[in-house]
């Protein structure tokens, strides 16, 4: 009897899962949008939402907790300097998961995960950044 039905194992060991979600959380904080499989995106919400809630109150203890979970200094700085203040008046629901169809090779359901209320990027700015 599986009381609670905790988390998706995603066919990985616990250390691999921890490292994968740590890397995905850093990527989401850095780029504010990522493309991944649907089960990973749904499980990543459980990792990233509490981190953004920590980022709303920039105490030293919260910064240390965030660094312990992310292990990336630049991501922690961005979390507390940009992302936390952006969601100061929002109580949860910081991410959006959009279904993107199925991957060509193995037909895995894909998803686009992004932070809500992220700044829009104009096409002209994107072209100048690419050059």
UniProtKB/Swiss-Prot annotation:
Oligomeric form and interacting partners: Part of the 50S ribosomal subunit. Contacts protein L32.
* Pfam families assigned to the protein according to its UniProt record, in alphabetical order: Ribosomal_L17
Gene name as annotated: rplQ
Lineage start: Bacteria, Pseudomonadati, Pseudomonadota, Betaproteobacteria, Burkholderiales
Could you list this entry's UniProt keywords, alphabetically sorted: Ribonucleoprotein, Ribosomal protein
Give the UniProt family note: Belongs to the bacterial ribosomal protein bL17 family.
Q: Does the keyword Protein transport apply?
A: no
> Which GO molecular-function terms appear in the entry?
structural constituent of ribosome
Protein name, entry field: Large ribosomal subunit protein bL17
């Amino acid at each position: 009897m599986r009381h609670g039905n905790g988390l998706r194992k995603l066919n990985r060991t616990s250390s691999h899962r921890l490292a994968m979600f740590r890397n995905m959380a850093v990527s989401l904080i850095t780029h504010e949008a990522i493309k991944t499989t649907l089960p990973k995106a749904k499980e990543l919400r459980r990792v990233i939402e509490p981190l953004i809630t920590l980022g709303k109150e920039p105490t030293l203890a919260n910064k240390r907790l965030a660094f312990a979970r992310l292990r990336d200094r630049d991501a922690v700085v961005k979390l507390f300097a940009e992302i936390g203040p952006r969601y100061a008046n929002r109580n949860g629901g910081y991410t959006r998961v959009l279904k993107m169809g199925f991957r060509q090779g193995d037909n895995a359901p894909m998803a686009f995960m992004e932070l809500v209320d992220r700044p829009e990027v104009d096409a002209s700015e994107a072209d100048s950044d690419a050059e």
